[in-house]
Curated annotation (Swiss-Prot):
Disulfide bonds join C26-C155, C44-C60, C128-C228, C135-C201, C166-C180, C191-C215. Keywords: Digestion, Disulfide bond, Hydrolase, Protease, Secreted, Serine protease, Signal, Zymogen. It is found in: Secreted, Extracellular space. The lineage of its organism: Eukaryota, Metazoa, Chordata, Craniata, Vertebrata. Residues 20-239 form the Peptidase S1 domain. InterPro entries: Peptidase_S1_PA, Peptidase_S1_PA_chymotrypsin, Peptidase_S1A, Serine_Proteases_S1, Trypsin_dom, TRYPSIN_HIS, TRYPSIN_SER. It holds the Pfam family Trypsin. This is Trypsin-1. It catalyses: Preferential cleavage: Arg-|-Xaa, Lys-|-Xaa.
Amino acid sequence: MKSLIFVLLLGAVFAEEDKIVGGYECTKHSQAHQVSLNSGYHFCGGSLVSKDWVVSAAHCYKSVLRVRLGEHHIRVNEGTEQYISSSSVIRHPNYSSYNINNDIMLIKLTKPATLNQYVHAVALPTECAADATMCTVSGWGNTMSSVADGDKLQCLSLPILSHADCANSYPGMITQSMFCAGYLEGGKDSCQGDSGGPVVCNGVLQGVVSWGYGCAERDHPGVYAKVCVLSGWVRDTMANY
């Protein structure tokens, strides 16, 4: 188990090895909900879900961090960025570091984000997305490519896989709070450094980049936290915290 999970968690340690595999450069600011979690370096992604709150993966937890919004080229100041520190970082109470179940956390910002054409929130789901729905995953994670400019936000279109295909890919490891997306033949996937980032389907945040076996490997699609199952906790926490 640890060897499987360790592959994705490398992104939180080796910040230079960051990007999406088999994707393309996102249209600039088309993913205006995408944020970078920073602790002196980019270590995970996240999604702005209101002017005060960001959703990310629980395995990306740090007690204090800085959220960078409005980014495209992560190493260049383009004049669109907002840098806001966290006031609270809250993991799902049933998150398990053993099997990465309920891999979601909320970050409350010390001040509201300014919403504009470069920074805006993504909607939370009111229902789960159907199998085969095409979604966009984005991030500054490992491209495993010498051609792709991974300092610029990368995007990838992926279909949601059936629970059966997901469970067959990872026997005994998939819970009701997880889903798989991608291609069983491999070649396209999220990777190290993308953890915590968004999976957006028809304008709705359906997934959080969580774990997988390697990156873009055959019969091992990416595994994502299933936001539609976890959104009750997200909404309750934002309302009551």
